[in-house]
């Protein structure tokens, strides 16, 4: 069974984008390439349990085992040594990516307190969109009672679009609630 959001992309978004930007081929229409979820755990240096818990939560949110990220270089001010585990990340592609994006847009973002839409300034100039989430509790898989500490995470949506305008139209078509 194809994902609901993927079907919407193929049936509604592709024709709309082709009409607006006059693409010569369906293959030229921008699409979501991958979604990267990153959770930096700064206090993992002093307490390794925090990193394990963060990785567990990231696995619940994404449905995929996270990769533990390590420090690239030592920074004395942060009491950080090279090679010490300081975070976790997950790269979603294909079906899981569409499922996550659908869940993010339709369930998780509306659960954010005082939510007025995601900022429009978070495009990087190459058609990718970055979104920071302040707490992991907005995701339905996270049980409120099991959370020891609120942690934020970064969500990077990588698209094949060449410009921010194309990328924004793509994400708007997929239901991303941008602030007015």
Curated annotation (Swiss-Prot):
Transcription found in the keyword field: no
One Pfam family it belongs to: Ribosomal_L5
Classification via InterPro entries: Ribosomal_uL5, Ribosomal_uL5_bac-type, Ribosomal_uL5_C, Ribosomal_uL5_CS, Ribosomal_uL5_dom_sf, Ribosomal_uL5_N
SUPFAM superfamilies attached to this UniProt entry: RL5-like
Source organism superkingdom: Bacteria
GO MF, any single term: tRNA binding
PROSITE patterns membership: RIBOSOMAL_L5
Cited function: This is one of the proteins that bind and probably mediate the attachment of the 5S RNA into the large ribosomal subunit, where it forms part of the central protuberance. In the 70S ribosome it contacts protein S13 of the 30S subunit (bridge B1b), connecting the 2 subunits; this bridge is implicated in subunit movement. Contacts the P site tRNA; the 5S rRNA and some of its associated proteins might help stabilize positioning of ribosome-bound tRNAs.
Assembly behavior: Part of the 50S ribosomal subunit; part of the 5S rRNA/L5/L18/L25 subcomplex. Contacts the 5S rRNA and the P site tRNA. Forms a bridge to the 30S subunit in the 70S ribosome.
Family indicated by similarity: Belongs to the universal ribosomal protein uL5 family.
The name this protein goes by in its record: Large ribosomal subunit protein uL5
Organism: Streptococcus gordonii (strain Challis / ATCC 35105 / BCRC 15272 / CH1 / DL1 / V288)
